[in-house]
Amino acid sequence: MGLQTAKWPSHGTFVLKFWLIMSLGLYSHVSKLLACPSVCRCDRNFVYCNERSLTSVPLGIPEGVTVLYLHNNQINNAGFPAELHNVQSVHTVYLYGNQLDEFPMNLPKNVRVLHLQENNIQTISRAALAQLLKLEELHLDDNSISTVGVEDGAFREAISLKLLFLSKNHLSSVPVGLPVDLQELRVDENRIAVISDMAFQNLTSLERLIVDGNLLTNKGIADGTFSHLTKLKEFSIVRNSLSHPPPDLPGTHLIRLYLQDNQINHIPLTAFANLRKLERLDISNNQLRMLTQGVFDHLSNLKQLTARNNPWFCDCSIKWVTEWLKYIPSSLNVRGFMCQGPEQVRGMAVRELNMNLLSCPTTTPGLPVFTPAPSTVSPTTQSPTVSVPSPSRGSVPPAPAPSKLPTIPDWDGRERATPPISERIQLSIHFVNDTSIQVSWLSLFTVMAYKLTWVKMGHSLVGGIVQERIVSGEKQHLSLVNLEPRSTYRICLVPLDAFNYRTVEDTICSEATTHASYLNNGSNTASSHEQTTSHTMGSPFLLAGLIGGAVIFVLVVLLSVFCWHMHKKGRYTSQKWKYNRGRRKDDYCEAGTKKDNSILEMTETSFQIVSLNNDQLLKGDFRLQPIYTPNGGINYTDCHIPNNMRYCNSSVPDLEHCHT
């Protein structure tokens, strides 16, 4: 018994401790639930006090809360109790859309993410940010912060700040004294016109800089301003007033550069020389008419280049861009190079530009500078094509009769043609009809192949308008078909050697205008072909007329059938209405007096039953019932005839009647 008595106290102590622990845990849980402010809603570690028209932060924010939602209220700077600063568990606070005019004090000391956008904050003090030593992300967008409203060195007090957003404020310059560990800075949509060389001096960790939508010019940016940003990966300076890209851009890590919507009209050759890791470049919506040759040579890692909406002038100075675009690697995506001038190539892609369409003076070593004079062909001055035998390698072919070349005496007294450079290729054009031209040529040197190009003039040129054909060197003529009547075409002939290229000096171009109606009286074939072409051109209109007439005929037939059907239906309805009306018990005889629904008193000695519908027989049977006359006689005639068309006469005298 003594041993058993000794064990009971130990067991009771264990049970007591167990119940005590359970009670404390339950109390702690209940106390947390009861600690939630009455005007808020608590869900685990989140407290929702947003959109409740609060003018101050509610008291009693429990410990353990990590995210505090206070946005879209009417909280002012006096609405932050001192006890809020001691809630250590809160790391994210949403205070956007309130009525703050200063950076608030007494925020939770360990807050890391703070949203203060869409307030009316005008001043930022060092004391306010000195309380937030762990702040990493600060959103101050869409406030009224000015440069003078930021105390010197205020942002430097937030020693842990990594992301600073100051978009849509009233800054006239970039604040000086930013935290050295800052990684992203947004000062877009402000009034910044000046960036001093000290603004980014210590920001060696900055990776993303956005200064879009400001008043920056090249004069307002100090020399070497961006050279300190050695880790910068993205730089956007869109919607400013730059005339050329900012100098001294850091090229160690820069990947994305956005320069669109400025006034850039010139890009220096060395502007992108150090940007060897650049992958994306946007120069759209500027005033660029040309580019310095080799400006993109150092961009070995470029993946995307956008150059839309620039007034590119496609003369000889842009020829290098055309060649560069043809040989860029497939990994590089280039968009936006479209010619805006001169008029003959407006709207044409620079990549597809044919230099033969332009008058480009070229210089050849040992030869004077010249410009081949294009022979403008008129339909009234063209001569028929001259057949010339193919030239052989050992002899100089004779010149065509219409244009004889100058000659000089040879060593044996014979004369040989020695044409100037501009006349080493003879080009002639013969009009077959209004949609076909035959081009003939004669070369005074050996040619492996020819490239003949033609394009319609006077219209905006897009891809596919310039047509070309490669022909062998033995061929000396080619027919161009499916041309438009009364249109001017520029035709160029380019001789190609074994490597498919020759100097531009041997290229010859000519312009020819097709006519609306050309009839060759001496050639029945051409005339017949022209008539066939005219018939072919008119056949679509004939087919369209036939189809239109057939459609109109079908519509008229359908309308006639519909009207006939409606007329027939209306007639049947009218007959049916008369038939129903004829079955009423008021319409039995020509004369009589209705007594009730079953007796009809006749006042005449005879009566006649007639059909009320002359088109079809009435349905049903009619029987004349016996009539008791005053003298006691019964006289009736059964008119039970299906068609009800016989007359029933009665010999009953006209006497006074009485009701029985």
UniProtKB/Swiss-Prot annotation:
Gene3D superfamilies: Immunoglobulins, Ribonuclease Inhibitor
Low complexity composition-biased segments: 372-396
Annotated keywords: Cell adhesion, Cell junction, Cell membrane, Developmental protein, Disulfide bond, Endoplasmic reticulum, Extracellular matrix, Glycoprotein, Leucine-rich repeat, Membrane, Microsome, Repeat, Secreted, Signal, Synapse, Synaptosome, Transmembrane, Transmembrane helix
Annotated compartments: Cell membrane; Endoplasmic reticulum membrane; Synapse, Synaptosome; Cell junction, Focal adhesion
Region described as Disordered: spans on this chain: 372-413
Coiled coil: none
Cytoplasmic side: 562-660
A single GO molecular function term of this UniProt record: chemorepellent activity
Membrane-topology annotation of the record: Single-pass membrane protein
InterPro entries (alphabetical): Cys-rich_flank_reg_C, FN3_dom, FN3_sf, Ig-like_fold, Leu-rich_rpt, Leu-rich_rpt_typical-subtyp, LRR_dom_sf, LRRNT
Function: Functions in cell-cell adhesion, cell migration and axon guidance. Mediates cell-cell adhesion via its interactions with ADGRL3 and probably also other latrophilins that are expressed at the surface of adjacent cells. May play a role in the migration of cortical neurons during brain development via its interaction with UNC5D. Mediates axon growth cone collapse and plays a repulsive role in neuron guidance via its interaction with UNC5D, and possibly also other UNC-5 family members. Plays a role in fibroblast growth factor-mediated signaling cascades.
Subunit: Self-associates (via leucine-rich repeats), giving rise to homooligomers. Interacts with FGFR1. Interacts with FGFR2. Interacts (via extracellular domain) with ADGRL1/LPHN1. Interacts (via extracellular domain) with ADGRL3 (via olfactomedin-like domain). Interacts (via extracellular domain) with UNC5D (via the first Ig-like domain). Can also interact (via extracellular domain) with UNC5B, but with much lower affinity. Interacts (via extracellular domain) with FN1.
Protein name: Leucine-rich repeat transmembrane protein FLRT2
Lineage: Eukaryota, Metazoa, Chordata, Craniata, Vertebrata
